[in-house]
Every structure is written in C-alpha cells, then in structure tokens.
C-alpha cells in the first residue's frame, strides 16, 4: 500500500493535465514506432550535416566523427543531465554512437555528391527538430515537471545539439541567427502540450505537433521567414 501511495502523482499535477490521470498514462496508447523512426532518421541526418560543418573547418576524420556524435546526441544528453534523467540515451543504446559515427564517415566519402541532396537534408533536419522537441517534452512530462520546464526540455533536445556543433566549429550558432529554428521548436512543444491539455490522446497530439512544426519550418525555409534582428553599433568613438 505504501509503495502504491508513493507511485501516485502529486494531486497538484493533476490540474496540469486534466485529460489524464497520470503523466505515464498519456503515452500508453501511443505506439513508439513513429517517434523512434523519426529519431533514427534525425540523428543520422544531424550527424551528416555536422560532418559537413566539420569538413568546412578542415578537421580530421576523428574530429568529424566527434562533431557528428555531439551534434546528433548532444541535445538529449544535455537535457538528461539538466533534468537528472539517467542513464543517458547513448549509454543505454551505444549503437547510436556507431550509427552517427558511421554516418559521418559515409558523408566524408560521398562529400562531392552531397550538394545534390541539400533539399533532402533540409527536410530531414526539419523532421529531426520537431521529433527531438516532442521527445524532449515527453521526457519531462514523464518526470511530472511543470509546463515551463517541459517546453524548455523540448527546446533543449531539439536545438542544443546544433548549438554545440556551431560552437565547436567556431561559428555563430544557428539558434542565435535570424532563421526560425528555436521558435519552431517552441511552437511545436506548445502545440503538443496544448493538444494534450484539451483532452486529445497522444496518438492525435504527436502527429498534430509534428505536422504543424514541420510545416512552419519548411515554410520558413521556402519564404525566408526571419526573426527581427537587433543591430547595435557603437559610434561613440
């Protein structure tokens, strides 16, 4: 009886998700196949784009593999460390390290033809962004954390890997430039949480969030939508 009482979520959290009895119950009807498939596509795509960034900086093959692994798995790892969610994903699934490292080596071998696949990688990157975001939100939800933390968890999972890549490659992170990237992650997470709070099942909420976020990202790329830019020049000298 005591163990059952300890497993029961605090009463105050029930008001956050009125359509569900517990945080874990939100996902019992959701087949993991869709998100898992998108996750695998995303880490491979992120690893390949990271390998190209490393190649532009004339890194050796070891550097290319490290940059690829950090980019593909760094967002989720940073999220788990900040939230105290252990073990880390790549510790449980070390095959992900081999996948990302292999993708990086393959990219180095076929680099001359990569330009022809630019649109494919943009689509895969957009899919990865929204899939990582939803996965990050779900991890925080399973830990029964506040909504704000859930949103931030989704953004960290979706965006932090790219920030680490750009920092290691000595570039201004894409997250801090004019492109709609972090904002797409935020909207995706908000739509997912909003759908769940309205009583939709995870089977409905996940596709809604993924479709809306993917559409927003692709439209931003197609029509060059940008965030307002702050420009400051010190003219006192």
Stretch-by-stretch model annotation:
Residues 102-139:
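Ordered, amphipathic secondary-structure segments that act as subunit-interaction surfaces
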Residues 36-49, 67-70:
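The first (N-terminal) embedded transmembrane alpha-helix
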Residues 31-43, 88-102, 146-158:
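Structural signature of hydrophobic alpha-helical transmembrane segments
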Residues 47-57, 80, 105-118, 163-174, ...:
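C-terminal ends of transmembrane helices
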Residues 230-237:
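Short, highly charged, low-complexity non-transmembrane loops/tails of multi-pass membrane proteins
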Residues 26-34, 81-91, 136-149, 194-205:
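Helix-coil boundary and interhelical linker segments in multi-pass alpha-helical membrane proteins
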